[in-house]
């Protein structure tokens, strides 16, 4: 189960990176917030994966786009910093 989650997160992150790298330099610069948040979400989830229960992993894997869904939730927040993002990810995992 854990390997499936690792593979899925890696695939989503690589697809995101690939889509960004196809953009112009100016467009990449304009997406720096998205790049930062998506990278941090990916890192947080990869770090947490070892501690997740099977039920939590199944719930995450049931999402269509794990990283983009969490990014969308972050966009609704007023502020952004790493600890708050980590809390957001943890809270979403708890309510799955």
PLM segments and residue spans:
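Acidic interaction surfaces
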Residues: 1-96
